């Protein structure tokens, strides 16, 4: 399915959380928790400013990001995978290799 978010929205595929503790214990279920890292799958054209101009987003397709997993983040099933739709302002950082 082709999908393009509007304005300053992005679509993020959540990365799997590490399932082992620091001591090597395998974590399952809620103990493993949800990851707040993901990969940008699609981006909107940018935020529309008051003067009508569009400010491009700082993130791009393929970026790994850390995001705020809370209010305003929508989970949607796309191609049988859960994807997150959020505003760029919900992204806290870009992970640089």
UniProtKB/Swiss-Prot annotation:
Signal peptide: none
Keywords: Chaperone, Cytoplasm
Record's GO cellular component terms: cytoplasm
Keyword check for Lipid metabolism: no
Primary location: cytoplasm
Cellular localization per UniProt: Cytoplasm
Disulphide bonds in the chain: none
Domain of life: Bacteria
Entry annotated with the keyword Metal-binding: no
SUPFAM superfamilies named among the record's database cross-references: GroES-like
GO-annotated biological processes: chaperone cofactor-dependent protein refolding
MF GO annotations: ATP binding; metal ion binding; protein folding chaperone; protein-folding chaperone binding; unfolded protein binding
UniProt function note: Together with the chaperonin GroEL, plays an essential role in assisting protein folding. The GroEL-GroES system forms a nano-cage that allows encapsulation of the non-native substrate proteins and provides a physical environment optimized to promote and accelerate protein folding. GroES binds to the apical surface of the GroEL ring, thereby capping the opening of the GroEL channel.
Quaternary structure (record): Heptamer of 7 subunits arranged in a ring. Interacts with the chaperonin GroEL.
Family: Belongs to the GroES chaperonin family.
PANTHER family xrefs: 10 KDA HEAT SHOCK PROTEIN (PTHR10772), CO-CHAPERONIN GROES (PTHR10772:SF58)
Record's protein name: Co-chaperonin GroES
Species annotation: Buchnera aphidicola subsp. Tuberolachnus salignus
Gene coding for it: groES
């Amino acid at each position: 399915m082709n999908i393009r978010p509007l304005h300053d929205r992005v679509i993020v595929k959540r990365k799997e959380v590490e399932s082992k503790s620091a001591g090597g214990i395998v974590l399952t279920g809620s103990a493993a928790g949800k990851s707040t890292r993901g990969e940008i799958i699609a981006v909107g054209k940018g935020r529309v400013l008051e003067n009508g101009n569009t400010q491009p987003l700082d993130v791009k397709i393929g970026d790994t990001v850390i995001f705020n997993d809370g209010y305003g983040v929508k989970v949607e099933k796309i191609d049988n995978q859960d994807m997150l739709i959020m505003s760029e302002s919900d992204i806290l950082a870009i992970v640089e290799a």
